[in-house]
Amino acid sequence: MMAPQTTRNDPRQRGQEAEERARAYLEGQGLQTLARNFRTRRGEIDLIMADGGVTVFVEVRRRSHPGYGGATASVDRRKRQRLSRAASAWLARHPGWARFDVVATDGHEVHWVRDAFREES
């Protein structure tokens, strides 16, 4: 049996492309990549970056159509809680200051929202 081919219509591939664009953009802004797709039982973080002495947990959102609402608004309470729990696991091993950012891509532009939300329990 042959593996299915991935195409530009594959949501996973589009998500990976959005994450790569976000990573390249943030590195261009002076941040350093610490980890990609950090997974725990509690959740996953798309990108973990360093901005000076601050650890930045980045949620990447791809929106194909502005009518679906803003990418930042799509990070609902449940998603914020999962991100917070995964971030706690990272910070248990790498203590320090941290913030949560959202990077939204629409295929052509990258929008970076620094300190998009606070940790939730």
From Swiss-Prot:
Record-stated family: Belongs to the UPF0102 family.
Protein name, entry field: UPF0102 protein Hhal_2103
Database matches in Pfam families: UPF0102
An example molecular function term from Gene Ontology annotations: nucleic acid binding
Superkingdom to which the source organism belongs: Bacteria
NCBIfam families recorded: PRK12497.1-3, YraN family protein
Organism of this sequence: Halorhodospira halophila (strain DSM 244 / SL1)
Gene3D superfamilies xrefs: 3.40.1350.10
UniProt xrefs under PANTHER family: UPF0102 PROTEIN YRAN (PTHR34039:SF1)
Disordered: annotated span: 1-20
Biased composition (Basic and acidic residues): 9-20
